[in-house]
Amino acid sequence: GLWQVREWEWREHGVDLTLARLSPLSAGQGSADPGRPNRPPDLTLAPTQLVACEVPWDGNPGTPVPMILALASSANGGWPGASLYVDQGDGALLPLGPSGRTRAVIGTASTVLQSASPLLYDRQSSVTIALAGEDLTLDDATMRQLAMGANRAVLGSEIVQFASAEPLGEGEWRLSGFLRGRGGTETAVTGHQAGEALALLGSAGTILNAEAVGAVPSSRIVAIGLGDSLPVSATIALRGIGMRPPSPVHPRWQVDLDGSYRLTWVRRARGGWLWQDGVDLP
């Protein structure tokens, strides 16, 4: 067997040793696979991409009005987030806080979304979107889910909902099956162009302090991350939509007995976007 020398001492007759016997090795013991470390992926610091917009009031008394969102993202998951600022037109950057590490689902339109009626389900139109990162995804939605507000996105100056998201590879998706002009954006169903920004509402957007942003129409939201050589800025899309009442509907005219014309319409209230059963829209 094997022994280990614990102590030793010189004596007249020689050297005294204190030994400890080692446990014998098992007969079948041999070398083993040391395994592989679970190292995190070594991702580069990709630059920040940013979309900023104001969204319509959702009818919840606890929701700030106006509600301005900064949706920041990047090409990969190694992005550590960014610091957000507002430039009110004088070049000074006023801090708004961090964006957080979770990437928002944003992208740009590679094709043009054609105009369509906001009163009907748009089965004909489609648009191709290049997302900020190839690992970002979009989901399909049923008609019931659309009626409850699923897949709302800002595309240019229009809020749309889409039922179908078809992956095309390399971060591109084809969106189709639209509800158009949502949230009082009916006037923006025309005038779309390639290169305009898309931002999926309900993803990792940061709610900004509206008082800190200010009311200057030319204000821009600025993001600065570790991978950015220069600040990234974006104008605030849909500015004022949270405070502006939607356009009226159901215009009618009639001739009274005295020959005069009577014009009538139905006003819409902010916040009444869901199609609730048994309740007329306000």
Predicted segments, located by residue:
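C-terminal extracytoplasmic interaction modules
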Residues: 1-282
